[in-house]
């Protein structure tokens, strides 16, 4: 390469770092495609690495993400009319909030993204800010709004690849799994690499295609280009092993993830779950406490509370449930919808009717995921309405992944309704899938299975689920969105 060309490349690199999101593609090329004549380029700074990761669809390291936030905060103070810098800053705030489980970042993200659109509207091509708003809505569990923003980008710029991860998450949250699959198809036509593999693994796992999901996650580990990418893919393998009822294998994947990136805090929680299943309870307490200290998510507090509950440590359990309520309240103040985890808590440890009211309202807002169906069905059961509960439990088990928790919930509902054969089949399924699925509920599942006994002569018909009273499976769950009038599970799934 001659001197003039070398200097031109250096000038482009400097311009790219100054320009922000509009130069993300350039940064990606400069960082990941070294010039063969000149040798490898100088090591990129943290801001450039974070931008390059964003271009690749990859997670930036926490340190690089923090550096990017500081860089863009400085940029917009000095250049308040830079719509692209505002869009990058807003998206970086969203990612920071997710990585730290700190919802206080989300109002700041919304302000930055809307400022970007004020400077340059979507009609004038500012689709980057719309993608950021979609990611923000997903982070707040506002999936209908995320769908709106993602579809706007898809309509304006159908080849803008980063709209499709937003749409996949939104459709999953709404329970529109065919649409999520179509969004993944579009993404794979536009992009390749580790993050597309990771997205594929997630979609396949949601559909219950575990072998396909594991194959994609394994390939993502092999092709990872950063420790953070590798840790995320290893964590996915850990989750798949956990769901299969293999805590020892899951623990190995979580440990490998933490070895790759010690700040991959979700793997700390996964590690705690696996340790508890292996009987290493004291270690599990410590791992959960470390995870919650670094990533204070209410679902982790619920898991630790239930682990304490199972051990008879009522005071410690109450402390965790209080922490959960505090975490949910803080999230809600910052626009995050945490009704699902709060409903799960209320069903088993608080007021089941309050859980019914909360989750029925969520269903009325179009949140028809299998997780929501399972939670609403269980809340109805715990509130004494097994007949209305069964259609929701059926949706969760029939349309979702092979989940031990979902199968147990359905089995208990069927047992209450006198549907002995189906109850036996689903509780058996729960214990075969993952005998350690919950420190609190797995022992109850074993007790229920023992109480059900063995099938009588002619057992195959009994075990098929066709015998017994099946009329409850067609119960009318109503037509509206108000509490007590949720739409039937099959109506808009």
Q: Can you say where each PLM-predicted feature lies in the sequence?
A:
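N-terminal leader/linker segments that initiate helical-solenoid repeat arrays
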Residues: 1-121, 125, 435, 439-486, ...
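Solenoid-like repeat scaffolds
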Residues: 77, 118-121, 152-157, 185-191, ...
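Residue-level recognition of tetratricopeptide repeat
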Residues: 91, 95-98, 135, 169, ...
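Generic helix N-cap/helix-start motif at coil->alpha-helix transitions
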Residues: 124-130, 156-164, 191-199, 226-234, ...
């Amino acid at each position: 390469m001659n001197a003039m060309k070398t200097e031109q490349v250096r000038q482009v690199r400097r311009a790219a770092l100054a320009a922000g999101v509009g130069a993300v593609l350039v940064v990606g090329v400069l960082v990941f495609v070294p010039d063969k004549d000149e040798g490898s380029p100088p090591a990129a700074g943290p801001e450039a690495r974070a931008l390059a990761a964003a271009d690749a669809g990859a997670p930036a390291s926490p340190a690089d993400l923090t550096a990017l936030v500081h860089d863009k905060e400085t940029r917009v103070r000095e250049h308040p009319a830079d719509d692209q810098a505002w869009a990058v800053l807003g998206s970086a705030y969203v990612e920071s909030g997710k990585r730290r489980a700190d919802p206080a970042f989300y109002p700041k993200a919304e302000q930055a993204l809307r400022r970007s659109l004020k400077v340059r509207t979507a009609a004038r091509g500012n689709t980057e800010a719309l993608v950021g708003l979609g990611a923000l809505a997903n982070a707040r569990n506002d999936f209908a709004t995320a769908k709106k923003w993602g579809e706007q980008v898809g309509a304006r710029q159908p080849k803008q690849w980063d709209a499709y991860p937003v749409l996949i998450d939104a459709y999953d949250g709404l329970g529109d799994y065919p649409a999520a699959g179509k969004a993944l198809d579009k993404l794979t036509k536009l992009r390749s690499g580790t993050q597309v593999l990771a997205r594929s693994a997630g979609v396949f796992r949601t559909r219950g295609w575990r072998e396909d999901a594991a194959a994609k996650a394994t390939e993502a580990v092999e092709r990872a280009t950063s420790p953070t990418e590798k840790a995320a893919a290893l964590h996915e393998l850990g989750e798949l092993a956990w769901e299969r009822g293999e805590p020892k294998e899951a623990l190995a994947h979580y440990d490998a993830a933490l070895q790759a990136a010690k700040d991959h805090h979700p793997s700390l929680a996964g590690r705690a779950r696996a340790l508890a299943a292996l009987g290493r309870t004291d270690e599990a307490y410590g791992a959960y406490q470390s995870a919650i200290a670094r990533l204070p998510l209410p679902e982790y507090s619920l898991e630790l509370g239930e682990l304490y509950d199972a051990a008879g440590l009522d005071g410690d359990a109450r402390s965790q449930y209080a922490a959960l309520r505090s975490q949910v309240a803080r999230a809600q103040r910052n626009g995050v919808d945490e009704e699902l985890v709060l409903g799960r808590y209320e069903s088993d440890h608080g007021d089941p009717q309050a859980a019914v009211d909360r989750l029925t309202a969520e269903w009325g807002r179009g949140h028809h995921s299998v997780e929501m169906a399972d939670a609403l069905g269980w809340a109805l059961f715990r509130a004494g309405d097994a007949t209305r509960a069964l259609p929701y439990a059926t949706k969760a088990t029939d349309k979702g992944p092979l989940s031990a928790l979902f199968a147990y919930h359905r089995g208990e509902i069927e047992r209450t309704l006198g549907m002995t054969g189906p109850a036996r089949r689903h509780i058996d399924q729960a214990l075969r899938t993952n005998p350690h699925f919950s420190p609190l509920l797995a022992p109850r599942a074993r007790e229920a299975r023992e109480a059900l006994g063995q099938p009588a002569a002619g057992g195959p018909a009994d075990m098929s689920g066709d015998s017994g009273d099946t009329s409850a499976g067609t119960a009318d769950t109503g037509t509206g969105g108000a509490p007590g009038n949720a739409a039937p599970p099959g109506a808009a799934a």
